[in-house]
Design a protein with these regions (language model features):
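Active-site acidic/histidine proton-transfer and metal-coordination neighborhood
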Residues: 51-152
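Hydrophobic faces of well-ordered beta-strands that scaffold small-molecule active sites
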Residues: 4-8, 41-45, 81-83, 117-119, ...
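N-terminal pre-domain/capping segments
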Residues: 1-45, 49-71
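Alpha-helix-loop-beta-strand connector modules within alpha/beta enzyme cores
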Residues: 23-43, 100-112, 139-144, 210
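Gly/Pro-rich active-site loop or hairpin
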Residues: 129-133, 137, 161-210
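Short loop/turn motifs at secondary-structure junctions
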Residues: 2-4, 37, 77, 113, ...
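Charged helix-capping and loop-helix junction motifs
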Residues: 21-27, 63-66, 97-102, 132-136, ...
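Active-site beta-loop-alpha junctions enriched in small/polar residues
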Residues: 11-13, 45-48, 86-88, 120-126, ...
């Protein structure tokens, strides 16, 4: 293919069941990546994870799954882990953002590797957090300074368009806003998609580019 960057799933994203990666599997992956010339590689964590939830059972599962995902990324030598900001199931957005950020910070503190956590922008459907750049900025600001270099943003073009950022009509303006609110240095990855929803619809529906 000639690809120089890739994103994978290290386990089934729709299941809680964890996957152990053996040393042999990890070594084989690292060799294959080097031989293929893939310079940047990372993972997207489970879609079930919600570090902003107020449900104790779901939160416990989410913490375990997120930490296990970080460990697999480290074992495979991946550069980044994309994660969603979660859903404020109790309706308190500020509390959800704070809880998510603190749990990410805890995971980074316990794992002194190089894997960078990238918070993905969302469309803002339902109680989804992170559809405004300011919400993601609030999360990053709660991460201690010593770990700040290991947290960034994954900008999903379909999501930000549905959230009301007019990439179609004012691409440069959106990037300027991103830079003003978050800092362009936080941009670690772009998910390039078109949107089935209209501008500002807050519908999380991807479409093929073009």
């Amino acid at each position: 293919m000639g690809a120089t960057a890739m994103q994978i799933f290290t386990k089934g994203p729709q299941r809680w069941a964890e996957r152990c990666i053996s040393g042999e599997e990890a070594a084989r992956f690292r060799r294959a990546r080097a031989e293929a010339g893939v310079g940047v590689a990372g993972s997207h964590d489970s879609y079930l994870i919600n570090l902003a939830t107020s449900d104790p059972e779901l939160l416990a599962k989410s913490i375990r799954a997120f930490r296990a995902e970080m460990d697999r990324c480290d074992r495979l030598g991946l550069d980044f882990l994309v994660t969603h900001p979660g859903n404020a199931t109790a309706g308190n957005r500020k509390a959800g953002l704070r809880q998510n950020a603190e749990l990410i910070a805890d995971a980074l503190n316990e794992r002194p590797g190089v894997v960078r956590v990238l918070i993905e922008t969302t469309a803002g459907a339902g109680s989804a957090l992170g559809y405004r750049f300011e919400e993601i900025a609030a999360m990053i600001e709660r991460v201690p300074a010593e770990h700040r270099a290991r947290i960034g943003v994954c900008l999903d073009t379909a999501h930000v368009f549905a959230a009301g950022y007019d990439l179609r009509g004012d691409y440069e303006g959106v990037l300027e806003t991103f830079d003003e609110v978050l800092g362009i240095d936080t941009l670690g990855l772009i998910h390039c998609n078109d949107s089935l929803g209209t501008l500002g619809s807050r519908r999380d529906r991807h479409a093929d580019i073009g």
